[in-house]
């Protein structure tokens, strides 16, 4: 999911499986609910025999502090496990005002680009 999105990560997973290699999710979403939700979806949709243990699910969320983008988490991590959110998208609701406030650079793409 950190390789350009979930679709790119799934491509890498297919390559790893063909090569007989393990995947290291490499994430530590101890702060970001959105990142942890993406990780949960990726790990749940990837065969377990391909995955190394994931940092997100070892340390849990909220270790660093509350997440301003998703202050009311829809899922939790306990003892290294979680249920994948089943709401639309990644299953978490983002606070739009916080997203605007935390955006560093915005690019607008139109049909003609």
Stretches found by the model and what they are:
Residues 1-81, 85:
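Shared catalytic-loop signature of beta/alpha-barrel
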Residues 89-113:
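Extended hydrophobic packing segments that form well-structured cores
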């Amino acid at each position: 999911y950190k390789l350009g999105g979930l679709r790119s990560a799934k491509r890498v997973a297919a390559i790893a499986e063909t090569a007989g290699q393990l995947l290291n999710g490499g994430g530590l979403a101890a702060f970001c609910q959105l990142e942890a939700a993406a990780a949960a979806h990726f790990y749940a949709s990837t065969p377990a025999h391909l995955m190394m243990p994931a940092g997100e699910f070892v340390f849990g969320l909220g270790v660093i502090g509350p997440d301003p983008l998703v202050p009311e988490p829809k899922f939790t991590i306990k003892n290294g496990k979680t249920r994948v959110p089943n709401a639309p998208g990644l299953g978490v609701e983002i606070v739009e005002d916080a997203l605007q406030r935390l955006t560093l650079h915005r690019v607008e793409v139109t049909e003609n680009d």
